[in-house]
């Protein structure tokens, strides 16, 4: 199925690209999320009229993500307190939701879907590196320090 991309999609294309994707991917994800429209003559003409507006929106989103990445990096580290046993293992785990809440409490609004825990949930005390994907091509890193309550 031919679609016109209205947003940059990682591993697929840039704004305005006409790409061929599987029908289910287009119907169930791209079109309902507003990331693409079907490539009909009317939609192609409509898109060409709106191309500058969509490219400006994409550039603004990228700039906002880069600014948020700079804020996250400026934090340096975030401390999370959790109940732990004698051997340094946590009762439970620190998940993406916990990290997002801690960073938001520190002053930078982060959604849990933007948090990347490379080794899965944090289950031990100490320093852990956490990455954030704020945009398709904007990443930030932060040191999360887990201490016992």
Curated annotation (Swiss-Prot):
Function, as annotated: Binds to the 23S rRNA.
Q: Which GO terms describe its biological process?
A: translation
Would the keyword rRNA-binding be found if you checked this record's keyword annotation? yes
By sequence similarity, the record places it as follows: Belongs to the bacterial ribosomal protein bL9 family.
One protein family per Pfam: Ribosomal_L9_C
Organism encoding this protein = Haemophilus influenzae (strain PittEE)
Per UniProt, the keywords (alphabetical) are: Ribonucleoprotein, Ribosomal protein, RNA-binding, rRNA-binding
Q: What is the lineage of its organism?
A: Bacteria, Pseudomonadati, Pseudomonadota, Gammaproteobacteria, Pasteurellales
PANTHER family per the UniProt record, alphabetical = 50S RIBOSOMAL PROTEIN L9 (PTHR21368)
One cellular component term from this protein's GO annotations in UniProt: ribonucleoprotein complex
Q: Which GO terms describe its molecular function?
A: rRNA binding; structural constituent of ribosome
Tell me the protein's name: Large ribosomal subunit protein bL9
This chain is encoded by the gene named rplI
